[in-house]
């Protein structure tokens, strides 16, 4: 019976010492997150398209929040995202990179001409949001609800059977973005 109490005491002491060491290590080696990075990342559209030159929205948010990158590189977000970033970071709004269509982007989705698709899966590998389904040597198709219109699947296609088509605005997909409407507080 005594050996049972010794074992319980030894394991309890070991657990207590391990907890103290892990607690100290967690505090000592804690990585502090920059709250500005989190706020910038929340504003970005999270399409992970790479059109800004970064592999995703989080790396672009880190580059913008450190002050080294321009706020006008997010093509899917358009002018709305750029204005929100300018307000958050207290910098001057900048014209968007690209042509005039970048200021007011039109939602587009990928369309695969299935008759010409050879099933090489290069578009599936390029899609950052897994919006393309299919198998090797079989037809592929795009799930338009998941497609962000990033255009990354078009270039790898060896048969040029993928094109970006604009999505018609209907009552089912139209969203009134109330955050873009300027609101002024009137004095009493």
Curated annotation (Swiss-Prot):
[4Fe-4S] cluster 1 binds at residues 49, 52, 57, 74. It comes from the Bacteria. It is found in: Cell inner membrane. One of its GO terms (biological process) is electron transport chain. The keyword Phosphoprotein does not apply. [4Fe-4S] cluster 2 binds at residues 117, 120, 123, 157. It is an enzyme of class 7 (translocase). Residues 32-91 form the 4Fe-4S domain. Keywords: 4Fe-4S, Cell inner membrane, Cell membrane, Electron transport, Iron, Iron-sulfur, Membrane, Metal-binding, Repeat, Translocase, Transport. GO terms for molecular function: 4 iron, 4 sulfur cluster binding; electron transfer activity; metal ion binding. Its EC number is 7.-.-.-. Residues 108-137, 138-167 form the 4Fe-4S ferredoxin-type domain. InterPro entries: 4Fe-4S_dom, 4Fe4S_Fe-S-bd, 4Fe4S_Fe_S_CS, Elect_transpt_cplx_RnfB/RsxB, RnfB/RsxB_Proteobac, RnfB_subfamily. Residues 1-26 are annotated as: Hydrophobic. Pfam families: Fer4_21, FeS. Its cofactor is [4Fe-4S] cluster. [4Fe-4S] cluster 3 binds at residues 127, 147, 150, 153. Gene3D superfamilies: 3.30.70.20, Electron transport complex subunit B, putative Fe-S cluster. Binds 3 [4Fe-4S] clusters. One of its GO terms (cellular component) is plasma membrane. Part of a membrane-bound complex that couples electron transfer with translocation of ions across the membrane. Belongs to the 4Fe4S bacterial-type ferredoxin family. RnfB subfamily. The complex is composed of six subunits: RnfA, RnfB, RnfC, RnfD, RnfE and RnfG. This is Ion-translocating oxidoreductase complex subunit B. It comes from Yersinia pestis. The lineage of its organism: Bacteria, Pseudomonadati, Pseudomonadota, Gammaproteobacteria, Enterobacterales.
């Amino acid at each position: 019976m005594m050996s049972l109490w010794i074992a319980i005491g030894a394991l309890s002491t070991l657990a207590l010492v391990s907890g103290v060491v892990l607690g100290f290590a967690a505090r000592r080696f804690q990585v502090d997150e920059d709250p500005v990075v989190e706020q910038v990342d929340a504003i970005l559209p999270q399409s992970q398209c790479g059109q800004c030159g970064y592999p995703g929205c989080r790396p672009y948010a880190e580059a913008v929040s450190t002050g080294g990158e321009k706020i006008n590189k997010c093509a899917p977000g358009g002018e709305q995202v750029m204005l929100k970033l300018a307000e958050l970071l207290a910098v001057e709004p900048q014209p968007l990179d690209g042509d005039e269509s970048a200021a007011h982007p039109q939602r587009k989705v990928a369309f695969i001409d299935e008759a010409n698709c050879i099933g090489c899966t290069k578009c599936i590998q390029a899609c950052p949001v897994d919006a393309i389904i299919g198998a090797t040597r079989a037809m592929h198709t795009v799930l338009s609800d998941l497609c962000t219109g990033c255009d990354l699947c078009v270039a790898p296609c060896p048969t040029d059977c993928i094109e970006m088509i604009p999505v018609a605005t209907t009552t089912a997909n139209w969203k009134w973005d109330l955050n873009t409407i300027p609101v002024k507080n009137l004095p009493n």
